[in-house]
A protein has these predicted regions:
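Membrane-helix interface "capping/anchor" motifs
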Residues: 135-146
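Hydrophobic alpha-helical transmembrane segments
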Residues: 6-86, 92-130, 150-233
Length: 233
């Protein structure tokens, strides 16, 4: 299928949320804003459903995941093949990735010293998952649908729960399964869109899927807002 009439490979942006290339816009696009918010919502839902809730712990967890997932993971991803076609220098991407990942790990270590040393298990797991998934280390064995669902769905939700509860119960596994299942749905929808935009240079067949992804983003974020708001009452 070729590009739509009047649309060329040069005018098809690599993602529905991508800004026009160049300068600060490349950095905004790099963050994948809708999807970063979507996956941060899993942290909030996990924390909000835990038996004990501390707003400060949630905020620190969100900060750590924003650095690790929103910045580091996406910077590594752009280093590995330039899927967003940004003009950000590779050196700047590498610095952003390692500084952000180090910042996230620092938050995690400080949190573990204050709230419980078992958090270090999650810190270590995150420090491995971010480069392993996005740089396709270990032969790319983690870079698949289930790797995405577990790393960017189940893991944030389970971490959000553990930050608050310092233990794992059935409910924690259930919320992790929710996040993994929704992430699989996201991946199923976004894969053909990425292929159309980035490999084929066409928007044909993307409109309905992308509209669905937009609404799912809003739904995920609003669920997180509702859960946290209920705990703050």
């Amino acid at each position: 299928v070729g590009p739509q009439s009047g649309v060329t490979n040069e005018t098809v942006r690599p993602a529905w949320y991508a800004l026009r290339g160049g300068g600060w816009r490349d950095w905004v696009t790099l963050l994948h804003p809708p999807y970063t918010l979507w996956h941060l919502s899993y942290v909030a839902v996990g924390a909000g459903l835990a038996p004990h809730f501390h707003l400060d712990r949630l905020l620190w967890a969100l900060a750590a995941f924003f650095l690790a997932m929103g910045v580091a993971a996406h910077a590594f991803d752009e280093l590995h093949g330039r899927p967003l076609h940004t003009h950000i220098p590779s050196s700047a991407l590498a610095v952003a990735a390692f500084v952000a990942l180090g910042g996230a790990a620092g938050i995690g270590i400080a949190a573990a010293s204050a709230w419980g040393w078992w958090l270090l298990v999650f810190v270590a797991a995150g420090a491995v998952l971010v480069p392993a998934y996005n740089l396709e280390l270990f032969g790319g064995r983690l870079h698949n649908d289930w790797g995405f669902a577990l790393a960017w769905g189940a893991f944030p939700a389970l971490t959000g729960w553990f930050v608050e509860a310092q233990t794992i119960r059935f409910e924690a596994l259930a919320v992790a399964a929710y996040a993994a299942a929704l992430s699989l749905a996201q991946r199923t929808l976004s894969t053909p869109v990425r292929r159309a935009r980035r490999a084929e240079g066409t928007l044909a067949g993307t409109e309905t899927i992308e509209r669905t992804l937009r609404w799912l983003t809003w739904a995920s974020v609003m669920l997180a807002v509702a859960v946290v708001a209920a705990r703050l009452r």
